Amino acid sequence: MNREIKKLFKSSIITFVLFDMDRTLVDTHTYFQEEMTNSILHTVSKIFPAKPLKKQLKITKEIVDIANKIYEQQRYPILVDTLSELALSQYIKEKKVKINKKKVYKELKSSYKDFYLTSPQPFPYTIEAIHKIKSFNIPIGVYSHAQNEWTRIKVDRIRNEYLKRYGEGIKIPFFTTDITDLKDKEGWIKAGKYHKINPKRTLVVGDSLTADIYAAIDAGYKYAVYLTHTNKYVEVEQRAHAKIFVTKNLSTVFNQHSFL
């Protein structure tokens, strides 16, 4: 465990850990990319049935790349079926492809009917990290920008896997903001009020420097862990009156060696 964080835990300076959910506790990125690729490939095969699979895969990749660019530019969360439709629409417009839009988009949307009924896989180190925090008797909670019911499904999966591994339950209260809300400090302020926590004594953990870390600090939180998901050095601008810990993932913060 990071020595400074361990010291903050042991001295009870930090009394709550508030997690972001997606790409922090569960691997939403992989789930998102795999499901979107499969759905778009299915749609592409209907639009271009005569083209060989290799060409269909190439077209699919181009559309997925467009979708990823659109996603990166969004200030608001966006549903996967809406994102896929926007990307496909841009592709067929650029390539001047004629399709029955109503039929194609309806079929594309239908392919995602179970998307928000399934939880992405928790990262391999998620359950252990939560257990390490619990060993300090520090409660945890979640704040997510995703829909309430989908967040509940993710939380339930984490709780079930925790119970299966350690033979005991764990409380994971969660708070969500509406999908139309901006990813800014207001959400973190609301999350703090919901969880009834002191932002100055809370450790925020998230994977987005802007939507999680800086937004939380702007909301008054003092401690944050930024998960980069890369082995490369990432330079982060520290903020006054706050401390940002930069690390690859939860495993490099709450690892087993810290308790040997």
Give the residues covered by each predicted segment.
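A metal-dependent, Asp-based hydrolase signature
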Residues: 62-111, 132
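An amphipathic alpha-helix signature
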Residues: 33-45, 80-89, 105, 148, ...
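Surface-exposed cleft-lining segments at the edges of enzyme active sites
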Residues: 110-120
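Asp-based, Mg2+/Mn2+-dependent phosphohydrolase catalytic module
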Residues: 1-17, 127-134, 138-260
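Catalytic beta/alpha-barrel core
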Residues: 121-122, 145
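Charged catalytic carboxylate motif
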Residues: 35, 39, 125, 187
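Short helix-coil transition/hinge motifs at the ends and kinks of transmembrane helices
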Residues: 48-56, 93-99, 161-168
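Active-site neighborhood of HAD-like aspartate-dependent phosphohydrolases
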Residues: 2-63
